[in-house]
């Protein structure tokens, strides 16, 4: 079974922003994840039908790869929520069905060092001889992040059964402190469910909170990338 690696495509500031979004919540009880999504939709998508057959987009990955099949199954509710049908292995396929190519992976550990500077008053002496001096103190923290990527490309089926015309393209990224892709995928699904196959008008950023006892909490964040 292939373990796909996430390749850092596009501007690296996107990954830095996802890390910075997480810093205020790293001490929270429930796990927090930084998620971004960028989706495009072509004019032919509205008339192309709503049935899709999943195909692996990772080079060298077979359709019977266990991880690919597991990821496709977890994506099915997102397709259903958007009014699409995702045909899995046991369902009969038709030549008129569209295709969706699924690419995904996880990065190597991303070690980041953050330094916090503060000034602490240091006082000595008494009465008129009392003096105060502000002393600079630095606190250094090391955090290890993992970046996961998921790319879904919807297209028509060509006469030879391969990739036809592009219909839509949805790319989603997730940053967290878990080193397992399937764990990071759980944080991506609530955002994907709202934006799959849509036109987002650019990249949008979210903080997702996952709690075993409650539904995921998704909060959109306004960020500025220089």
Predicted stretch roles:
Residues 7, 82-83, 137:
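Short alpha-helical segments and helix-capping/turn motifs at coil-helix boundaries
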Residues 29-43, 139-226:
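C-terminal/domain-edge helix-coil "capping" segments
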Residues 1-10:
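N-terminal secretory signal peptides that target proteins for export/translocation
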Residues 14-25:
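Bacterial N-terminal signal peptides
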Residues 38-57:
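Post-signal peptide N-terminal segment of mature Sec-exported envelope proteins
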Residues 53-113:
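N-terminal segment of the mature soluble domain
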Residues 102-160:
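Surface-exposed short loop/turn segments
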